Swiss-Prot record:
Originating species: Sus scrofa
Glycosylation sites: 5, 26
Record protein name field: Potassium voltage-gated channel subfamily E member 1
MF terms in GO: delayed rectifier potassium channel activity; potassium channel regulator activity; transmembrane transporter binding
Keyword annotations of the record: Cell membrane, Glycoprotein, Ion channel, Ion transport, Membrane, Phosphoprotein, Potassium, Potassium channel, Potassium transport, Transmembrane, Transmembrane helix, Transport, Voltage-gated channel
Chief place of localization: membrane
GO BP: any one term: negative regulation of delayed rectifier potassium channel activity
Membrane side Cytoplasmic: residue ranges: 68-130
Positions where Phosphoserine occurs in the chain: 103
Post-translational modification: Phosphorylation inhibits the potassium current.
Amino acid sequence: MALSNSTTVLPFLASLWQETDEPGGNMSADLARRSQLRDDSKLEALYILMVLGFFGFFTLGIMLSYIRSKKLEHSHDPFNVYIESDAWQEKGKALFQARVLESFRACYAIENQAAVEQPATHLPELKPLS
């Protein structure tokens, strides 16, 4: 059975506290300074909690409004009804096909008549310098 060794920590902490404390310092001034620091730290903690609270409140509000705006099940808005229908997709396909056909009609090739009329003529080439 292992015995707890919690009593050995207390002398170590006491000696550590005495080393960090100023020797010959004014004890009442030191206590006043420490109490003032404790009051300030309470206000700092309150300030941090308030900032986090406001941030959380605004974040929650933005998140809920975003979620609410994405619910389209009960929306009878004409735009949402139009998006849910397939009519716009059919119109989009027809418009895409018309544009493709129009672009094919606008494309044409220009041929070099001199090259077509003389297919047996040898074209000059640059000979590599070796």
